[in-house]
From Swiss-Prot:
Residues reported in the UniProt entry to bind NAD(+): 19, 23, 30-31, 97, 99-100, 115, 182-183, 207, 226
Organism: Geobacillus kaustophilus (strain HTA426)
Name the record gives this protein: NAD-dependent protein deacetylase 1
InterPro entries: DHS-like_NAD/FAD-binding_dom (IPR029035), NAD-dep_sirtuin_deacylases (IPR050134), Sirtuin (IPR003000), Sirtuin_cat_small_dom_sf (IPR026591), Sirtuin_class_U (IPR028628), Ssirtuin_cat_dom (IPR026590)
EC number(s) from the headed UniProt entry: 2.3.1.286
Binding annotation for nicotinamide: 30, 99-100
A Pfam family assignment: SIR2
UniProt keyword Cytoplasm present: yes
Keyword Metal-binding: yes
GO molecular-function term, one example from the UniProt record: NAD+ binding
Length: 242
């Protein structure tokens, strides 16, 4: 059996996407020293509640940079193919560690965002939400007087309970679980493939570098761009089910 045949036969495919999915769109990642965001900022210090209140200027500069960078990038072929696979009933759920909103922009509808979204900001006091571009125009406080912050999970904050529950349920239902561009170092996302495997799912990992779960996977692909691999799989799917 091949990845293509598993995709064709699957009744419930769940996809987990990580930073590698976003970097192919040109977005810098958090975890690459001297590249990505570490070249200009220290995310472990600035992406925190403490920085929001006590290093406000640096916090705002950091997230203005991230929002501006996001506006300059767009979904790639991999995002668009996953959306197409959802429309065709090949993919049922996408769980993402990314905050860029590219899956939704590409057309995916069933997306679970574990770490929130950089597409909106919200008030720490009243919870009112606004499009994140207002941050670029210096709108940093809410009408109620509360502090506005990006709607992402900051270091030290709990992940949204609803997203975790939905992701866990999706993993339990999966008969095929694809990992795309995740190093599987961050919990609880790195537990989802294990949940799927325990429930009998096939596990496929496509990531540039090896992961700690590679030995448990039914298929592993390294050193390949995700968009290219998905394009190849899509072409093979057309041959399996023309």
């Amino acid at each position: 059996m091949t990845i293509t045949s598993w995709l064709a036969a699957s009744r419930h495919t769940v996809v987990l996407t990580g930073a590698g999915m976003s970097t192919e769109s040109g977005l810098p990642d958090f975890r690459s020293p001297r590249t990505g965001l570490w070249a200009r900022f220290n995310p472990s210090e600035l992406a925190t509640i403490d920085a929001l209140y006590h290093r406000r200027e640096s916090f705002v500069e950091f997230y203005q940079y991230r929002i501006r960078t996001l506006q300059q990038c767009q979904p790639h072929d991999g995002h668009r193919l996953l959306a197409d696979w959802e429309r065709r009933g090949i993919v049922q759920t996408i769980v993402t560690q990314n905050v860029d909103g590219f899956h939704q922009e590409a057309g995916s509808r069933r997306v679970i965002e574990l770490h929130g979204s950089l597409r909106t900001v919200h008030c720490q006091r009243c919870g009112e939400s606004k499009p994140s571009f207002v941050y670029l125009h210096g709108v940093l406080t809410c009408e109620c007087g509360g502090v506005l912050r990006p709607s992402v999970v900051l270091f030290g904050e709990p992940l949204p309970e609803k997203a975790i529950t939905e992701a866990w349920e999706a993993a339990q239902q999966a008969d095929l679980f694809l990992v795309l561009g995740s190093s599987l170092q961050v919990s609880p996302a790195n537990q989802l493939p294990l949940v799927a495997k325990r429930n009998g799912a096939k596990l496929v990992i496509i990531n540039w570098e090896p992961t700690e779960l590679d030995d448990l996977a039914d298929a592993v692909i390294h050193q390949r761009k995700i968009g290219e691999v998905l394009n190849e799989l899509n072409e093979q799917l057309a041959e399996v089910d023309p």
